[in-house]
Amino acid sequence: MSAVPHDSPAHPPVVCLLGPTASGKTAAALALAADAPVEIISLDSALVYREMDIGTAKPTREELAVAPHHLIDIIDPADSYSAAQFVADAERLIGEIHARGHVPLIVGGTMLYYKALTQGLNDLPQADAALRAELDQLAAERGWPALHAMLAEVDPVTAARLAPNDAQRIQRALEIHRLSGQPMSALLARQAEGRTFAGAADQRYRVIALEPSDRLALHHRIARRYDAMLAQGFIDEVERLRARGDLHPGLPSIRCVGYRQVWEYLDGEADFATMRERGIAATRQLCKRQLTWLRSTPERRVVDCLATDYVDQVRRLADFGH
């Protein structure tokens, strides 16, 4: 194992390994753990949940033993975890890991968390439980595509980048418009114009992005992985969550890709084949959103995740001195 890279004391290194779902982030991260004393900080809004292992592709017990991992299995599925909580946790962990003489390795694909950490949190209105309940009721009566059409009337920019069934994001955009009287896209644009960022531009961040040279090949990989999850007992996992009695499809945990589709299957809203198709399609949509976020990250160094030597390329870019 090599020593920690020699960066300026003012800029101790933080390596970020970003990529869409099924891009091979775990394998690359574990390879980096063989090169330097890293501690892995999960950048994944689904891995925070306990009792959700198969559908989140959570690292195995053996993989978790290779290096210290953080922000995995930290909250109950009945609870929520925000970008603000992630930033607070990640900043604390980065300091603690550096104090131990180790390298923080941030690994994942929840780009909202990455942007919040490196660019700061936005000042959008806080969630309003009563308004969300009202929107949920409206969606139950008319369907999320109808609410997507409503959003298109007041915030066409945001609506254009959201799928008609992207319930969580449609709800948030409508909520922001109702509370502020302004489109979310306009608020975000103004904040971006007035903000000066120190985060990702800081020399301490080494940002490596795993991106596919062939989107179709990654789509095939996503389908194979979803089928493997089903074979491993994904449906049984969701059945156990349902049996608790305190969870429902409106929770962020159950809105995670794959879980919502299996929940609908268990509710009798879809047959097995339809559930499988919807789960794969939702995962591909997630992948598309992740890649869109990544490509708006100019500080990244890109590695083709389909290349046979992609792990070696990641190791070279991480620059641990080997």
UniProtKB/Swiss-Prot annotation:
PANTHER family associated with the record: TRNA DIMETHYLALLYLTRANSFERASE
Record-given protein name: tRNA dimethylallyltransferase
GO biological process: tRNA modification
List of residues binding ATP: 19-26
NCBIfam families xref list: miaA
Family assignment from sequence similarity: Belongs to the IPP transferase family.
SUPFAM superfamilies linked to this entry: P-loop containing nucleoside triphosphate hydrolases
Site for Interaction with substrate tRNA, residues: 110, 132
Keyword terms, alphabetized: ATP-binding, Magnesium, Nucleotide-binding, Transferase, tRNA processing
Record-linked Pfam families: IPPT (PF01715)
Region feature (Interaction with substrate tRNA): 44-47, 168-172, 255-260
Entry cofactors: Mg(2+)
Function: Catalyzes the transfer of a dimethylallyl group onto the adenine at position 37 in tRNAs that read codons beginning with uridine, leading to the formation of N6-(dimethylallyl)adenosine (i(6)A).
Sample GO molecular function, one term: tRNA dimethylallyltransferase activity
Chain sites annotated for binding substrate: 21-26
UniProt-listed InterPro entries: Dimethylallyltransferase (IPR039657), IPT (IPR018022), P-loop_NTPase (IPR027417)
